[in-house]
Amino acid sequence: IKPYDRNVATKIIEDFMLIANETVAQDYFWQELPFVYRTHDNPDTEKIKKLGTFINNFGYTIHIGQDEIHPKELQKLLMKIDGTPEEALIGRLTLRSMKQAKYTTVSTGHFGLATNYYCHFTSPIRRYPDLQIHRIIKDNLRGRMNQKRIEHYDSILPEVAKHSSEMERRADEAERETDKLKKVEYMEERIGQVFEGVISGVQEWGFYVELPNTVEGLVHVTSLTDDFYHYEESSYEMIGERTNKHYKLGQKVKVIVA
């Protein structure tokens, strides 16, 4: 198991798609026609602070001003980690700290892409919102966008956006569960083996460790038998009461698969 590698060709294609999606969204926003936008709200401040604590252990920092962060800060972070051993891990945790994007009929901007206008236009063969947008564009280009047609789209698009967002979340969850199942099957053959990983999350009940092969598992607090550990919420770490031993975000540890 290894992280997916985005090569130069992939990045070029992604850039073309982003530009096309942004251009179409901006054009139809200013035409003031009914439309389906792809929006992404600002991240939760607490999650961003947690991300900042995590990356500090790798020597990186992000500037958080007045309880909010500018998307350029995260873009700079991703540029700094490009090609480094910790790129995949920090990239995934950065993504987890974001809110989930959704489909809406009002353009409120896209935080992750740092743009005011965005939509999904480039893949009508596999995403319904893209197909809906192509129908709107077709009506508009052929001169059929009269008042009756506008009222039609005004009546159906809110439900289209809501349903598409719900179905996307279901599909994402199914994909995550499938990935988890395959990772469990893979690690089942490696029970008893020792791996080195990085602490990717800390909670009252223990901490999570992510291995270089992207598999993540829980080290429950009851398995830490050398001391009684308590959770320090302010610094996201487990601290031993007698030994003062620390387990914190970003720390490298060795684990036994059980």
Residue ranges and their predicted role:
Residues 188-194, 228-255:
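Short nucleic-acid-contacting surface segments enriched for D/E, G, S/T with interspersed K/R
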Residues 1-211, 218-220, 225, 229-233:
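Append "with occasional cross-activation on large, charged helical scaffolds in nucleic-acid assemblies
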Residues 202, 255-257:
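A generic structural signal for residues embedded in beta-strands
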